[in-house]
Amino acid sequence: MSARFGVVVFPGSNCDHDAYHAAHDVFDQEARFIWHEEASLGDVDVVIVPGGFSYGDYLRSGAVARFSPIMQDVVRFAEDGGLVFGICNGFQVLCEAGLLPGTLMRNESLRFVCKDTPLRVENAGTPFTNALTEGQVITIPVSHGEGRYYADEDVLARIEANDQVLLRYSTADGAVTDEANPNGSVHGIAGLVNEAGNVCGLMPHPERCVESLLGGDDGRLIFESLLNHVSIVAA
């Protein structure tokens, strides 16, 4: 089971090394950094658009990064069916680039939120969640100031009807409540995929919890899902 990971790096990215560490050091996969000024992704199986504050979050989170030269090839790769995984700021970039529906707004509290967060699995049938089970509750940390997912009613209805929601913020026993929602995201949405299922945006940080030494390793399940999918496709 082997996959080639490309981790996109923008000015202001600060979770790129965490994503690289998870793929290369923890899972022993081929991985490399891809600078924002590059024109081609090269030979990769999975593109990770990592967290951080790309371009200082000027204008709004992800708004400048989506115009980086490398994003043209990220869009091309996604449209060709390649796996693209946006984490936190990466989620914001993918929404700005039109690869995912909706947008991310300032947290309802107007405060930065950084804590471990229980998440209920809604769809375990995607390349990003196949190592999980529907209804399972996992815990992954969040760390963001603009993580409130929003879409209009028509878009939300389509997302829900297509089973595009992967994870929702929940209590430890799986109840989706306002109190369990750290940022005010509509429908408690923490992560979702595009209609084709090959592009994922996730506000929590699975790359920060792939080793039990750090207090939890539920994030491993996301990376294991990606490796499972790549292995099946390669076969």
Swiss-Prot record:
Catalysed reaction, written as an equation: N(2)-formyl-N(1)-(5-phospho-beta-D-ribosyl)glycinamide + L-glutamine + ATP + H2O = 2-formamido-N(1)-(5-O-phospho-beta-D-ribosyl)acetamidine + L-glutamate + ADP + phosphate + H(+); L-glutamine + H2O = L-glutamate + NH4(+)
CDD domains: GATase1_FGAR_AT (cd01740)
GO CC list: cytoplasm
Gene Ontology biological process terms in this record: 'de novo' IMP biosynthetic process
Pathway(s) this gene product operates in, as recorded in its UniProt entry: Purine metabolism; IMP biosynthesis via de novo pathway; 5-amino-1-(5-phospho-D-ribosyl)imidazole from N(2)-formyl-N(1)-(5-phospho-D-ribosyl)glycinamide: step 1/2
Entry's localization field: Cytoplasm
UniProt KW keywords: ATP-binding, Cytoplasm, Glutamine amidotransferase, Hydrolase, Ligase, Nucleotide-binding, Purine biosynthesis
Gene Ontology molecular-function annotations: ATP binding; glutaminase activity; phosphoribosylformylglycinamidine synthase activity
Record-listed E.C. numbers: 6.3.5.3, 3.5.1.2
Record InterPro entries: Class_I_gatase-like, PRibForGlyAmidine_synth_PurQ
Domain Glutamine amidotransferase type-1: 5-235
Entry annotation: catalytic residues: 88, 205, 207
A Pfam family that the UniProt record links to this protein: GATase_5
Chain's role: Part of the phosphoribosylformylglycinamidine synthase complex involved in the purines biosynthetic pathway. Catalyzes the ATP-dependent conversion of formylglycinamide ribonucleotide (FGAR) and glutamine to yield formylglycinamidine ribonucleotide (FGAM) and glutamate. The FGAM synthase complex is composed of three subunits. PurQ produces an ammonia molecule by converting glutamine to glutamate. PurL transfers the ammonia molecule to FGAR to form FGAM in an ATP-dependent manner.
Complex formation: Part of the FGAM synthase complex composed of 1 PurL, 1 PurQ and 2 PurS subunits.
PANTHER family the record matches: PHOSPHORIBOSYLFORMYLGLYCINAMIDINE SYNTHASE SUBUNIT PURQ
Official protein name in the record: Phosphoribosylformylglycinamidine synthase subunit PurQ
Organism from which the protein derives: Salinibacter ruber (strain DSM 13855 / M31)
